[in-house]
């Protein structure tokens, strides 16, 4: 606090200006005007002066005060009120108050405990006017505590009482002065402590000595003191707490012994301490609960101030099972919080991600960039052949089976401009790869074969392009074939809301032939025209930012990621963060296989130097240093693990019943290795979709790279099928597989994997049986046989009745028995079967209650061929 005037200081302290001036002068400071400035040193001098005067006032106060009181009363002594005699009794009371500082303290300073006190036997002379004998009854001696200081005798003179009265008046005046000074000191200490802290040694808190208050509230203070509620300033020695009427009967009187120990006082004090002053809320308390992406049940209950058992009950009522330490996801947490009547607040723990965005240097130089074009369409409609013609290479011949199974990223320089092409797979298994291609592109070229028309993958490609809000250019391929019908293609595409410009729409249609090269130049012109309309621009300086198109594990080079740079410039030696992985860029390889030092916007390059294989579709950014990259990567890995665990543990009651029955279902374990990450995801997804309620496909391990010894060990331990897609096993893995009789299946086309796994699952299906009724016989009469029992004489009214087949006995179309046909005879001969229209005798095994009119239904069980 800065220097203030005397007037301002008086207002802060809360006393009149004249009084503050007097106190300043008493402290030795020359102040006469209220506009004079008081600095910090003068405030300290005034504070020390007031503390000293307070201490003197306290020391001047008497250390012990004795209070005496007399009271007169009349008591009737006798058998009744009329014949009894009245006795005048004088009762004297004496109470002594001793200052606490005069008694040695035995407890801690912070919370002093009342020292034990002993009351010496005191004799009171009582004048009794009656005819009763003048004997003084004996009073029992009270020894409540060990002796500390004897109490003065009560046979003192009236002068001492007057002296006490004068002491009381003096104490009252001193108390008023002390109280006033104390208030001033407290206010002044607050002012001084704003800038200069006062040490504990300098702090002196004067005790308030007020005799009048003690004398007025004696009874309440003593009762509170006994209960342990209050520690009085003075020790009270009370000789006659309860009025004891003493008659002069001779002898000496002693006080009654008061039973009460120090231990019981402590218990009373503890009970008083444990009682709280809070009232039970009458209205429900609605709390704002912060919910992160994952949270345990115990932590969620703590944030709602309820027990974890209550949260578990609510989750069970909602159909979800959980334990107190289980991690639940954000969606489940929000439902639980709302169900319990609180307000959920969703928070995103992305402080690290936000810091990453701030740390990335952003460029300012903007230039035009080449368009990124994705070629989409159905299988074998000529996507890669078109790109092959444009690049003048043989890409299609290099793909297994002639179909594309990777995302190919190529940068093509044409006489009219540069274009970056992304070639996506066309078959259904690569939906995720195709979706990633649409998200990273500017223009989509939809290839449709003129002789085949619109197919399911064609429709799916249209949906991806519309979802990404990317313009479409339709290329009608295979126009060199004689059965080409472009009008049919246009009609089918118009159904999918792709209207050609010739029909008044906004989609360009180009007729081409990837084999002969017809219309290729027109297609390139359409692409460049569309890019000019889009006005594609990107920042060329600053940190690079892009997307991972594909990734793989290359033998000798390690993890390799194909990155399409979208903004900035990627240099060799930069620290690149891609999803969960990071690393220093050791080399940049162009799509032609050349080593380059940098890559600008719309340029695809292969990056070497990452710590592991990133996921296709992950965002790749250049960060300032490796420390920041490691921090963000570890944060993402931890968050991904928590979210995955929460989703895995989200078990419903229905799921528990499924798991109970799932033990009976058969599982086909698979260890899968592929050459690139995108193919691995597509194969794993396609195989998982083959699962049914009876048989399941479990990809227990999947990875990018060759088959190693650890993969073979895992397949042996889990009894799994080992599949390699465009990869081979090393020598150690081959030898181990031969020793353990583990077969390794190699594939280069995804359809072959799906077909073989589907066949294996079909063989694992449990056989299904169907009952077929082969014949029905009507009972006409019943005969008794001593060997078999009841024999039913029947007429075969439908089909054929065969011996040893299972049968059912029907009475009024109700099945009353199911068993086996034991005996079948025609006349007296045993026969194997009886056809429709013939009579026969039928003996039912272990059943004799056959009556005329019953129907005997003969059936057999037939196995049905199962299929997925």
Swiss-Prot record:
Binding site for GTP: 377-384, 423-427, 477-480
Disordered: annotated segments: 156-177, 199-269
InterPro entries on file: DNA-bd_dom_put_sf (IPR009061), EF-G-like_DII (IPR053905), EFTu-like_2 (IPR004161), IF2_assoc_dom_bac (IPR013575), IF2_II (IPR044145), IF2_N (IPR006847), P-loop_NTPase (IPR027417), Small_GTP-bd (IPR005225)
Region annotation (G5) ranges: 513-515
Region (G3): 423-426
GO molecular function, one term: GTP binding
Superkingdom of the organism of origin: Bacteria
A cellular component annotation (GO) from this entry: cytosol
Segments of skewed composition (Basic residues): 249-260
Residue span(s) of domain tr-type G: 368-537
Stretch list, region G4: 477-480
Subcellular location: Cytoplasm
Region (G1): 377-384
Annotated Basic and acidic residues bias: 156-166, 199-209
HAMAP family hit by this protein: IF_2_B
NCBIfam families found in the cross-reference section: IF-2, small_GTP
Function: One of the essential components for the initiation of protein synthesis. Protects formylmethionyl-tRNA from spontaneous hydrolysis and promotes its binding to the 30S ribosomal subunits. Also involved in the hydrolysis of GTP during the formation of the 70S ribosomal complex.
Protein name: Translation initiation factor IF-2
């Amino acid at each position: 606090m800065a220097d203030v005037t005397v007037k301002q200081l008086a207002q802060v302290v809360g006393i009149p200006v004249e009084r503050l001036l007097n106190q300043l002068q008493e402290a030795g400071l020359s102040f006469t005007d209220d506009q004079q400035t008081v600095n910090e040193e003068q405030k300290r001098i005034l504070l020390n002066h007031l503390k000293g005067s307070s201490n003197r006032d306290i020391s001047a106060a008497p250390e012990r005060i004795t209070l005496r009181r007399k009271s007169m009363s009349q008591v009737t002594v006798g058998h009744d009120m009329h014949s009894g005699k009245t006795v005048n009794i004088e009762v004297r009371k004496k109470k002594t108050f001793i200052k606490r500082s005069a008694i040695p303290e035995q407890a801690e300073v912070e919370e002093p405990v009342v020292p034990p006190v002993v009351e010496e036997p005191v004799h009171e002379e009582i004048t009794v006017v009656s005819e009763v004998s003048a004997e003084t009854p004996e009073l029992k001696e009270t020894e409540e505590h060990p002796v500390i200081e004897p109490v003065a005798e009560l046979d003192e003179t009236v002068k001492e009482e007057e002296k006490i009265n004068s002491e009381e008046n003096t104490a009252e005046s001193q108390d008023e002065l002390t109280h006033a000074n104390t208030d001033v000191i407290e206010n002044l200490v607050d002012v001084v402590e704003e800038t200069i802290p006062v040490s504990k040694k300098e702090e002196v808190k004067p005790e308030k000595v007020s005799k009048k208050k003690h004398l007025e509230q004696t009874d309440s203070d003593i009762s509170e003191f006994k209960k342990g509620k209050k520690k009085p300033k003075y020790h009270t020695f009370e000789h006659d707490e309860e009025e004891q009427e003493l008659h002069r009967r001779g002898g000496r009187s002693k006080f009654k012994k008061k039973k009460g120990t120090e231990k019981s006082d402590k218990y009373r004090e503890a009970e008083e301490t444990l009682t709280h002053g809070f009232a039970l809320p009458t209205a429900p308390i609605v709390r704002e609960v912060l919910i992160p992406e994952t949270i345990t049940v115990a932590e969620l209950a703590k944030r709602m101030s309820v027990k974890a058992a209550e949260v578990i009950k609510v989750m069970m009522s909602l159909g979800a099972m959980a334990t107190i330490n289980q991690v639940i996801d954000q969606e489940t947490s929000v439902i639980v919080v709302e169900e319990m009547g609180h307000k959920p607040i969703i928070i995103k723990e992305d402080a690290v991600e936000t810091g990453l965005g701030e740390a990335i240097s952003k460029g300012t130089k903007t230039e035009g960039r080449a368009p990124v074009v994705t070629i989409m369409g159905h299988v074998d409609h000529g996507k890669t052949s078109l790109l092959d013609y444009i690049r003048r290479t043989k890409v299609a011949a290099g793909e297994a089976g002639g179909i594309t199974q990777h995302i190919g990223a190529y940068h093509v320089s044409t006489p009219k401009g540069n274009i970056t092409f992304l070639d996506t797979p066309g078959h259904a298994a690569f939906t995720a790869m195709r979706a990633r291609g649409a998200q990273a592109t500017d223009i989509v070229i939809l290839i449709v074969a003129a002789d085949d028309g619109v197919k399911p993958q064609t429709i799916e490609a249209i949906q991806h392009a519309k979802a990404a809000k990317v313009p479409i250019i339709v290329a009608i391929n295979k126009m060199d074939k004689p059965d080409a019908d472009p009008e049919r293609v246009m009609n089918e595409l118009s159904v999918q809301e792709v209207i050609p410009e010739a029909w008044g729409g906004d989609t360009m249609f180009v007729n081409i032939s990837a084999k002969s090269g017809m219309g290729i130049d027109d297609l390139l012109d359409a692409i460049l025209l569309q890019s000019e309309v889009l006005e594609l621009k990107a920042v060329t300086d600053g940190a690079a930012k892009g997307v991972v198109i594909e990734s793989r594990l290359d033998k000798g080079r390690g993890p390799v990621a194909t990155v399409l740079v979208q903004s900035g410039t990627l240099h060799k030696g930069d620290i690149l963060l891609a999803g969960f992985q990071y690393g220093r860029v050791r080399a940049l390889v162009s799509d032609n296989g050349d080593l380059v030092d940098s890559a600008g916007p719309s340029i695809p390059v292969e990056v070497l130097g990452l710590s592991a294989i990133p996921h296709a579709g992950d965002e790749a950014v250049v960060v300032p240093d490796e420390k920041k990259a490691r921090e963000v990567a570890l944060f993402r890995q931890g968050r991904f693990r928590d979210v995955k665990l929460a989703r895995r543990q989200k078990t419903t009651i229905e799921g528990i019943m499924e798991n109970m029955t799932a033990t009976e279902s058969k599982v086909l374990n698979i260890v899968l290795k592929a050459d690139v990450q995108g193919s691995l995801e597509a194969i794993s997804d396609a195989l998982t979709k083959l699962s049914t309620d009876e048989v399941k496909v479990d990809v227990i391990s999947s990875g990018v790279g060759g088959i190693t010894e650890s993969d073979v060990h895992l397949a042996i331990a889990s009894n799994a099928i080992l599949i390699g897609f465009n990869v081979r096993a090393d020598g150690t893995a081959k030898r181990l597989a031969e020793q353990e009789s583990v077969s390794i299946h190699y594939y280069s086309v995804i359809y072959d994997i799906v077909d073989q796994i589907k066949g294996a699952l079909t063989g694992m299906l449990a056989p299904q049986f169907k009952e077929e009724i082969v014949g029905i016989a009507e009972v006409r009469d019943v005969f008794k046989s001593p060997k078999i029992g009841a024999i039913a004489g029947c007429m075969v009214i439908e089909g054929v009745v065969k011996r040893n087949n299972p049968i059912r006995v029907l009475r009024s179309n109700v099945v009353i028995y199911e068993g086996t046909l034991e005996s079948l005879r025609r006349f007296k001969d045993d026969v194997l079967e009886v056809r429709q229209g013939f009579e026969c005798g039928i003996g039912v095994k272990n059943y004799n209650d056959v009556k005329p009119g019953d129907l005997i239904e003969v059936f057999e069980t037939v196995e049905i061929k199962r299929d997925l």
